[in-house]
Swiss-Prot record:
This is Mitochondrial inner membrane protease subunit 2. Component of the mitochondrial inner membrane peptidase (IMP) complex which at least consists of IMP1, IMP2 and SOM1. PROSITE patterns: SPASE_I_1 (PS00501), SPASE_I_3 (PS00761). Its main location: mitochondrion. It comes from Saccharomyces cerevisiae (strain ATCC 204508 / S288c) (Baker's yeast). It is an enzyme of class 3 (hydrolase). Changing residue 91 to H/R: Abolishes enzymatic activity. Changing residue 95 to D: Reduces processing of CYB2 and presence of IMP1 and SOM1 in the IMP complex.
Amino acid sequence: MFRAGSSKRFLRNTLIAISWVPVLLTINNNVVHIAQVKGTSMQPTLNPQTETLATDWVLLWKFGVKNPSNLSRDDIILFKAPTNPRKVYCKRVKGLPFDTIDTKFPYPKPQVNLPRGHIWVEGDNYFHSIDSNTFGPISSGLVIGKAITIVWPPSRWGTDLKLSTGRDCISKRAILE
C-alpha cells in the first residue's frame, strides 16, 4: 500500500500546485492570454486560408490596453462588440482619440472626429468586416487585448501583424504629446 512518506509528499505537491492557480488566473485575466481568431474580416493578415477550417491563435497582451495611449495605429486588437458584450471582434486600430477619419458606407457621415477615449477600428478585408464603419468609434474600455504574435499554427510564426492591408482612412492625425 502507501507509505506515510509518499502520501505526505503527494499532499505537499498537490497543495503547491493548487497554490499556483490564483497566480496563473491573475496572469491570464490581466496580463497575457491566448485567443482564437475566427472569421475572414482580418484576411490576409489572420486566417488567410479560407479553404481549410484552420484558424490562427494569437498571444494577447492585456495589461494597460484600455488606455488609448498604449495603443498605436495598425495594432490588431480584440474587443467586446459595442452592440453585444458577449461577442468579441478582432480588428485593426486605424484611428486614435482626436483623429479625423474618412468613413465608408454604411457610416452615416463622410467624416468623424474621434472623441477622447475612443478609437476607430477596421478589418483588413473591408468587404467582409463589421467594424467602426458599422457601429462608429468604440470606447477604449471595450478593448480586451492587443495581438502580439501568432502562436498557432507554427507555419505562421513570424507573421508581421503590423503590416496592414487595409485602407488609410485618416484625413487628420491628432498631435499627441
